[in-house]
């Protein structure tokens, strides 16, 4: 971490000496490219290697710093078999008066995080995980909290004006295919010493949820989602990808009925309030985001719960936890029928200049993120005696379930999940107010949410 921060500081100093203090920002025209290598490591997925590319079309420059259209492409590979492919497009000119944002994403994850439902009601044994990493004689326990998932996303979003430059309608179609199940132990154990391999006779949490009936037979394995999204948006941001002031408020419903091809139908909604408060204009900004995602009715398939639903140039992301939602918290730590999360951060653009005919800036960020389960997913033991080959196996499974549940928070009408909070800081490289490379570190306040995480990614969260 220290080496990374020192290297980043050296880059800032060197480019500041080369560059000129910015007086009049260069208005960009035509096509601008933003390539970036994607390199990371995960103990269960292995090394990540890949690349991403942002393409911005500013046309004649009339709308700069907001582009007429933009492409985002990414391909990443992990040494133990996981892959990520992303292709999204966002244009304001293809359809007159309508913003069109299609995208296709394929994620093949051999070791996806799975910590159960309802936040702290699902106990995370961080001591056992640490023992598996630090004790040479103990097997790695982290695969216990993993599942395998292949996820295909195809979407097409449309946005049009109701009141010029302020109020908009939103509509979209989404198609998702989920294939989810237990991990492939051979792939997860690949390259590990025999004593560190996750044993075949130890069930993962996902496998236990199946045995206890928390994840039903109908939902096990995944399914198809086909549905519409309908919503409204109020947007007064001065710059879309790097705002200094304004409001950005959205509310939309997700409708995935059976007759449209959805395997396990559901209906959900998402409300998001974002506010950008200029303290020193174009230098220091207080930005915060409040989100509430709920389920209409009392049920939704477990595999749709982790996602933060979005319109526009991006696509639905795993949450809550991770770079796009709650930085520093383990990915998918908070899943429930209804969840809420917040982000609050100070953004200080401490230097800006022009270099090689590009507008360059560096920004420091201090932040706090958090999430909470508001309405719980049903975690009751649903199996019957007839589901087991003997009463002894039934009793053993029931006792195992009771022991597991006794370690977490017990839900009742007045006692919901506690806040999962993190704090952290980051540095961003900003080119032409659109291509943004972020270096951030987040630390949870509770070890039940992990030990913290360092991210190298693109853009602002919001």
Could you tell me what each predicted segment is?
Residues 20-31, 59-68, 94-99, 163-169, ...:
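Short loop/turn motifs that connect adjacent beta-strands in outer-membrane beta-barrel proteins
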Residues 25-33, 41-224, 320-324, 448-462:
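Gram-negative/organellar outer-membrane beta-barrel architecture
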Residues 33-35, 49-51, 83-87, 150-156, ...:
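Hydrophobic, lipid-facing positions within transmembrane beta-strands of outer-membrane proteins
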Residues 51-73, 229-272, 424-430, 435-440:
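Surface-exposed extracellular loop regions of Gram-negative outer-membrane beta-barrel proteins
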Residues 228, 239-356, 376, 395-396:
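C-terminal outer-membrane beta-barrel translocator/porin domains of Gram-negative envelope proteins
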Residues 290, 430-462:
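Predominantly the C-terminal beta-signal and adjacent terminal strand-loop region
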């Amino acid at each position: 971490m220290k080496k990374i921060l020192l290297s980043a500081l050296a880059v800032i100093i060197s480019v500041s000496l080369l560059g000129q203090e910015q007086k009049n920002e260069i208005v960009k025209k035509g096509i601008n490219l933003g390539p970036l290598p994607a390199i990371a490591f995960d103990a269960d997925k292995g090394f990540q290697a890949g690349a991403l590319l942002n393409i911005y079309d500013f046309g004649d420059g009339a709308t700069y710093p907001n582009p007429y259209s933009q492409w985002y492409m990414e391909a990443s590979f992990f040494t133990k078999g996981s892959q990520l492919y992303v292709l999204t497009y966002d244009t304001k000119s293809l359809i007159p008066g309508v913003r069109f944002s299609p995208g296709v994403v394929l994620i093949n994850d051999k070791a996806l995080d799975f910590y159960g439902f309802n936040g702290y009601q699902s106990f995370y044994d961080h001591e056992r995980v640490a023992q598996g990493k630090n004790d040479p004689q103990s097997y790695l326990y982290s695969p216990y909290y993993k599942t395998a998932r292949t996820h295909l996303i195809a979407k097409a979003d449309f946005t049009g004006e109701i009141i010029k430059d302020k109020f908009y309608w939103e509509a979209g179609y989404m198609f998702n295919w989920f294939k989810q199940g237990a991990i492939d132990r051979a792939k997860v154990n690949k390259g590990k010493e025999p004593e560190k391999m996750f044993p075949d006779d130890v069930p993962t949490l996902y496998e236990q949820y199946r045995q206890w009936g928390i994840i039903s037979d109908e939902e096990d394995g995944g399914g198809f989602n086909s549905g519409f999204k309908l919503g409204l948006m109020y947007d007064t941001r001065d710059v879309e990808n790097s705002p200094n002031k304004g409001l950005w408020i959205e509310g939309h419903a997700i409708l995935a009925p059976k007759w449209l091809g959805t395997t396990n139908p559901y209906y959900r909604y998402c409300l998001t309030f974002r506010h950008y408060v200029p303290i020193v204009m174009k230098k220091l900004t207080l930005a915060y985001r409040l989100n509430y995602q709920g389920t209409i009715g009392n049920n939704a398939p477990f595999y749709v719960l982790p996602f933060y639903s979005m319109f526009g140039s991006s696509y639905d992301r795993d949450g809550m936890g991770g770079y796009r939602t709650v930085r520093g918290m383990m990915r998918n730590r908070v899943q429930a029928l209804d969840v809420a999360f917040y982000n609050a951060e100070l953004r200080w653009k401490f230097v800006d200049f022009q270099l090689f005919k590009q507008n360059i800036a560096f920004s420091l960020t201090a932040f706090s993120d958090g999430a909470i389960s508001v309405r719980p997913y049903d975690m009751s033991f649903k199996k019957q005696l007839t589901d087991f080959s003997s009463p002894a196996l039934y009793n053993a499974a029931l006792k195992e379930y009771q022991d597991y549940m006794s370690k977490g928070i017990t839900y009742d009408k007045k006692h919901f999940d506690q806040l999962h909070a993190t704090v952290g800081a980051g540095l961003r490289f900003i080119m032409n107010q659109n291509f943004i490379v972020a270096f951030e570190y987040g630390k949870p306040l509770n070890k039940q949410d992990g030990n913290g995480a360092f991210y190298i990614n693109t853009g602002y969260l919001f």
